[in-house]
Amino acid sequence: MAWFFAPEPVMVTADEALKGGRHTVLENPAPHTVLGTPVTGPWKEGQQRIWIGLGCFWGVEQMYWQMDGVEGTSVGYAGGFTPNPTYREVCSGRTGHTEIVEVVYDPSKISLEQLVARGLEAHDPTQGFRQGNDVGTQYRSAYYTENEEGAARVKAVVDAYGETLKQHGFGEITTEIGVISPSEYFLAEDYHQQYLDKNPDGYCPHHSTGIPCGVEA
């Protein structure tokens, strides 16, 4: 009997990536269907942003818009090379992007660490280029911030959780942590925005390890 296995996903290089360069995929997006807030701003004074990738972005966005202190969410793509990518292009693995949720929050009501911890608990950050049966570089675990100070705070939470996971027999965390500018986050098509509000019977499972992160709420 022969066994056939799909090759492991490989991250595309900048030279290999699709060139893109077209107009923005989603221009003039409608307000958030749940929160009623603008998807692209203007933001209130004091609001902050973080970009989070935990696999399929439909369920991740719903999880975050339900959190107290979160005042805006959208879904899109970041971490790659191709400007203004389409969903189909991202799914090809030839853009370098991962599926991302932009979270706009009030730091006086919820901390960056709490947002990071909630994400870590909602997926398996040791799976590399996959989450469950969703396989590809576009499903990799990632946190992107607007500055190095934010990235350092994210790394502290991720590193601590990595030690906890090791104590429970898990491998190394593969979460990508970086700094991006807002212009490096590309909105996904309208169809994907607040998908599980528009499609209540839609399916997008989380792949939690079941191990708590330990960050105080």
From Swiss-Prot:
Entry EC no(s): 1.8.4.11
Active site per the UniProt annotation: 56
Entry GO CC: cytoplasm
BP GO terms, sorted: cellular response to oxidative stress; protein modification process
Disulfide bonds: none
Catalyzed reaction equations: L-methionyl-[protein] + [thioredoxin]-disulfide + H2O = L-methionyl-(S)-S-oxide-[protein] + [thioredoxin]-dithiol; [thioredoxin]-disulfide + L-methionine + H2O = L-methionine (S)-S-oxide + [thioredoxin]-dithiol
Enzyme class per UniProt: oxidoreductase
InterPro entries: Met_Sox_Rdtase_MsrA_dom, Met_Sox_Rdtase_MsrA_sf, MsrA_MetSO_reductase
Keywords assigned: Oxidoreductase
HAMAP family xref list: MsrA
Function per UniProt: Has an important function as a repair enzyme for proteins that have been inactivated by oxidation. Catalyzes the reversible oxidation-reduction of methionine sulfoxide in proteins to methionine.
Protein name: Peptide methionine sulfoxide reductase MsrA
Source organism per UniProt: Corynebacterium melassecola
